[in-house]
Amino acid sequence: MPDYDLIAILGPTASGKTPFAAALAAELNTEIISADSRQIYRGMDLGTGKDLEDYTINGRQIPYHLIDIADPGYKYNVFEYQRDFLTAYETIKQKGCLPVLCGGTGLYLESVLKGYRLIPVPENQELRVRLAEKSLEELTAILSSYKTLHNSTDVDTVKRAIRAIEIEEYYAKTPIEEREFPQLNSLIIGVDIDRELRREKITRRLKQRLDDGMVEEVRRLLAEGIQPDDLIYYGLEYKYLTLYAIGKMTYDEMFTGLETAIHQFAKRQMTWFRGMERRGFTIHWVDASLPMEEKINFVKQKLKEF
């Protein structure tokens, strides 16, 4: 095995990156580290698209890390992700394996691939008051003016956007010291799915997850005492399904709004990954529609080329 420290599999939602990563991990006899900002929560399964059955290949369970590690309602952040990633990474490396990082949360991916440690950012009440009356569109415009690392792909609520700006303001005014974080030599593989196929898969998967009980999952979380605002904070499925569950939306409004939001989210993910390329990352793109064996051979060939 060449001197790569990590293989990263990234792609938009519904691109098939998880089955690909699991099949690759089975082939290389290794383990997966998730890079998904919502799959870290226990009990939030259908709404985050965990699809844990994808980690079973030919009857063999592929070990995965950083899924189901926090309770719903908790505000897990990128600083904790870096810490937990390193723990998982070192655990896998100690077994003599090449870890596979897989996910679609741009901030989490880039925070470990870029190789510098982020530091916790305190709340700025004065800034929060100043931004409180602004719309999500206005806040997104402010956020896009910053050049540093914040993941606008996951900013789909006012609360998240304000927190994102708070982080950017803090970094803009705080000298960035050299921070200890391993410089990982990573082979980055992007799963490129045709736009129309992606849209079709998103809609089909949304209908399937609703049939499987996604509304009931949200109602259960609410019944367990998770506050509606906390679920709405997680965005996408949890935002729309919570608004439906508490009577603020009809079923049709929920479905149409959520379907549109997921399509927009996937588009923003691709914009983020293209931005990574502009920021100096080399992403080797593989066609999502290729047979699994061909995709795995593509990665193995890239490993040999190193």
UniProtKB/Swiss-Prot annotation:
Catalytic activity: adenosine(37) in tRNA + dimethylallyl diphosphate = N(6)-dimethylallyladenosine(37) in tRNA + diphosphate
Site, Interaction with substrate tRNA: residue positions: 105
Region entry Interaction with substrate tRNA, spans: 36-39
Binding-site positions, substrate: 13-18
EC number in record: 2.5.1.75
Record: residues binding ATP: 11-18
GO molecular-function terms, A-Z: ATP binding; tRNA dimethylallyltransferase activity
Swiss-Prot/TrEMBL keywords: ATP-binding, Magnesium, Nucleotide-binding, Transferase, tRNA processing
GO BP annotations listed: tRNA modification
Cofactor: Mg(2+)
Top-level EC class as recorded in UniProt: transferase
Subunit relationships: Monomer.
Free-text function comment from the UniProt entry: Catalyzes the transfer of a dimethylallyl group onto the adenine at position 37 in tRNAs that read codons beginning with uridine, leading to the formation of N6-(dimethylallyl)adenosine (i(6)A).
Protein family according to the UniProt entry: Belongs to the IPP transferase family.
Name this polypeptide is given: tRNA dimethylallyltransferase 2
Organism: Bacteroides fragilis (strain ATCC 25285 / DSM 2151 / CCUG 4856 / JCM 11019 / LMG 10263 / NCTC 9343 / Onslow / VPI 2553 / EN-2)
